């Protein structure tokens, strides 16, 4: 549970303000668990208002689901990625990536990429290619490894994956060791490093789409895998209430 007090009601520390506003973000590995936790948070807020004889109002902002992987589509995307090859960089781009890499004061001891944590073979591969995690930006493709292990993050692609077979890839749009949500990541957004990797991702997606149109048996296999998982997981539960309306973040209630 994350929270931010967006409006304390006033500046005076010795006064009980007439109103206050707080933003909560409730997260879990499975969307159904997040929704149950959200209901509990709502009940706690209501109970607190009853204890203080105040009025509680709530406004839903947004929500997204966990992502359901599809091995058939992921394998196909990896094959196309492997055929197209990874991006390579100019001396100027490598110099820029190195400067950002060096600016990260607290570097992680982990190797780049989640898969290195799940497979000894991939760990050794990444360790060699990244020179023990010291390469500023990666220029290699990690071997494919199917995994249902949860990865932390939030994306509306998760909701799509509950409705149709879905797969994703990652390209090197920012330097290694740059923490998520960091200024180092943001600093790469308008660079040629990010642009060429975005174009590469588009090519991989396009090539995969062509394969699915030309190979209906592969598309059917992806659908079969999707249907089996939906039967196992119980189908899609939309985290957004039917009466929800768009909200401007930070807007006073």
Describe the role of every protein-language-model region.
Residues 64-253:
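An extended, acidic, His-containing surface patch that forms the Zn2+-binding/catalytic region
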Residues 1-114:
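Midchain, well-structured core segments that form catalytic/ion-binding scaffolds
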């Amino acid at each position: 549970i994350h929270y931010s007090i967006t409006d304390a009601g006033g500046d005076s520390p010795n006064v009980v303000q007439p109103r206050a506003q707080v933003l909560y973000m409730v997260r879990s590995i499975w969307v159904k668990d997040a929704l149950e936790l959200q209901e509990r948070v709502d009940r706690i807020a209501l109970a607190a208002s009853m204890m203080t004889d105040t009025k509680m109002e709530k406004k839903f902002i947004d929500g997204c689901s966990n992502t359901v992987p599809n091995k058939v589509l992921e394998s196909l995307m990896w094959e196309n990625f492997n055929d197209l090859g990874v991006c390579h960089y100019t001396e100027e781009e490598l110099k820029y990536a190195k400067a950002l890499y060096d600016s990260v004061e607290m570097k992680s001891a982990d190797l780049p990429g989640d898969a290195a944590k799940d497979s000894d073979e991939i760990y050794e591969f990444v360790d060699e290619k990244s020179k023990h995690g010291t390469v500023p930006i990666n220029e290699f493709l990690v071997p494919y490894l199917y995994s249902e292990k949860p990865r932390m993050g939030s994306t509306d692609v998760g909701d799509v994956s509950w409705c149709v077979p879905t797969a994703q890839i990652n390209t090197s749009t920012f330097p290694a060791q740059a923490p998520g949500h960091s200024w180092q990541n943001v600093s790469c957004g308008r660079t040629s490093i990010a642009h060429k990797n975005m174009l590469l991702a588009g090519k991989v997606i396009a090539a995969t789409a062509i394969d699915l149109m030309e190979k209906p048996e592969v598309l059917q296999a992806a659908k079969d895998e999707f249907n089996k998982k939906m039967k196992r997981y119980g189908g899609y539960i939309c985290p957004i209430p039917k009466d929800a309306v768009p909200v401007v973040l930070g807007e006073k209630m």
